[in-house]
Amino acid sequence: MEWVPARDGKLPEGRRVVEGGYESSGAKLYHALGVVNGVKVPGKAGEHLGGANLPFGGQEHVVREYEVLCWR
């Protein structure tokens, strides 16, 4: 597996993204890694989110540029 750049809720074309789970609505979630205040933070991404949601400092931060975990 490897981290691949993504942005704005779009998945990298031609890549198999590792699924991380589902929202209660059934929307797929993917493993994300992004930066909040200079710190790399794991979180979730989904096409329906328009970015990645990253928990940090007791809050959930939304970032537009992040990485998603993909199969090689």
Describe each model-derived feature in a short phrase.
Residues M1-R72:
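A structural motif
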